[in-house]
Amino acid sequence: MKHVAPPPTTEAVFGDRLPLAQRYAEFLATAGVERGLIGPRETDRIWDRHILNSAALGELVESGDRIADIGSGAGLPGIPLALARPDVHVTLIEPMQRRCEFLTEVVDALGVAVIVVRGRAEDPAVRREVGEMDVVTSRAVGSLDKLATWSMGILRESGRMLALKGARAEAEIEENRRVLARAGAVDVRVLRCGADYLNPPATVVEARRATPSNGRGRPGRSSRR
């Protein structure tokens, strides 16, 4: 496999799982490129732009959280998050068979307890299979209005959507406030994370699924906590 050297700050993020993160980087730089999951020009910035950017979400989750990564693609942000935070439970949701095969190969090779589910987050069958989640993550999957609709559908009451976004995050929130509200998303805000090892830090849109007391919620569905 191609060796992709991590930056010096990476050990603080992954700890004793750094060798697994390095192996994942090699997967991305080889099979990921060959299968069209990562662009060939991305190999020189796999760590900063992809792996560390994804792992930064580890600052925003809690121990024991059940996390669904929707439209996982090459495993971003789900796999780096699982490596940085072995105390959470990650499920990768991806509709394309060839991508699911790649994800399964990576998960098996790394020996991590990550579940791969083929399907779309909005599919009732997927929702039944994965149940209600504490957190839903996403990266480069779709517009904020679509992400909110997909995410709220598999979140428990008060569960959180964490969507990695770019410089237009604030503007995207303003443009979609009505749709976000209809989807049951409340407390929508922009967070920055990974400032100790990313320049600029990762930009994340956080939203909570409404409960009957603060918004729409879903009548008849109970929260986990």
From Swiss-Prot:
Entry-linked InterPro entries: rRNA_ssu_MeTfrase_G, SAM-dependent_MTases_sf
Q: Which UniProt keywords apply?
A: Cytoplasm, Methyltransferase, rRNA processing, S-adenosyl-L-methionine, Transferase
Q: Which Pfam family is one of this chain's hits?
A: GidB
Q: What subcellular locations does the record give?
A: Cytoplasm
Q: What is its EC number?
A: 2.1.1.-
Residues at which S-adenosyl-L-methionine binds? 71, 76, 121-122, 139
Location of the region described as Disordered in the Swiss-Prot/TrEMBL record? 204-225
Q: Output the Gene Ontology terms for molecular function.
A: rRNA (guanine-N7-)-methyltransferase activity
Q: Which GO terms describe its cellular component?
A: cytosol
Q: What does this protein do?
A: Specifically methylates the N7 position of guanine in position 518 of 16S rRNA.
Family, per entry: Belongs to the methyltransferase superfamily. RNA methyltransferase RsmG family.
Q: Which PANTHER family match?
A: S-ADENOSYL-L-METHIONINE-DEPENDENT METHYLTRANSFERASES SUPERFAMILY PROTEIN
**HAMAP family, alphabetized:** 16SrRNA_methyltr_G (MF_00074)
- Its recorded name reads Ribosomal RNA small subunit methyltransferase G
